[in-house]
Amino acid sequence: MDSNTVSSFQDILMRMSKMQLGSSSEDLNGMITQFESLKLYRDSLGEAVMRMGDLHSLQSRNGKWREQLSQKFEEIRWLIEEVRHRLKITESSFEQITFMQALQLLLEVEQEIRTFSFQLI
């Protein structure tokens, strides 16, 4: 994984954790948790691709990896919609910048996961 992507994830997670969104802080914590989960999943797919012979290991370890991949794409789509919604309703420039960067990162990660998954198929 690209070191810029790692720092982008860490930066966005740190910024999101500092936001005070009042009653929606539970929702934000859920988004942060999903971001972290997505990062770990993307990293594990990337490592599997780097080892290329690891496809059989990946399949035997998790016979439902295609189903899991589909679920991750659903999570990404949900996060994209949630981030877009937050972007529309927030008035704080700090939050707008953070959510714009989060949206860009989600789109990049979605593309990376697609690329990794095509290499594994």
Curated annotation (Swiss-Prot):
Keywords associated with the record: Host nucleus, Host-virus interaction, Transport, Virion
A GO-annotated cellular component: virion component
Motif (Nuclear export signal): 12-21, 85-94
Transport among keywords: yes
A Pfam family that the UniProt record links to this protein: Flu_NS2
Transport keyword on record: yes
Predominant cellular place of this UniProt entry's protein: virion
BP-aspect Gene Ontology terms: exit of virus from host cell nucleus through nuclear pore
InterPro entries: Flu_NS2 (IPR000968)
Superkingdom of source: Viruses
Subcellular compartments: Virion; Host nucleus
Family of this protein: Belongs to the influenza viruses NEP family.
Function field: Mediates the nuclear export of encapsidated genomic RNAs (ribonucleoproteins, RNPs). Acts as an adapter between viral RNPs complexes and the nuclear export machinery of the cell. Possesses no intrinsic RNA-binding activity, but includes a C-terminal M1-binding domain. This domain is believed to allow recognition of RNPs bound to the protein M1.
Oligomeric and partner information: Interacts with protein M1. May interact with host nucleoporin RAB/HRB and exportin XPO1/CRM1.
Miscellaneous information on this protein: Average number present in a viral particle is estimated to be 130-200 molecules.
Name listed for the protein in its UniProt record: Nuclear export protein
Source organism per UniProt: Influenza A virus (strain A/Whale/Maine/328/1984 H13N2)
Lineage: Viruses, Riboviria, Orthornavirae, Negarnaviricota, Polyploviricotina
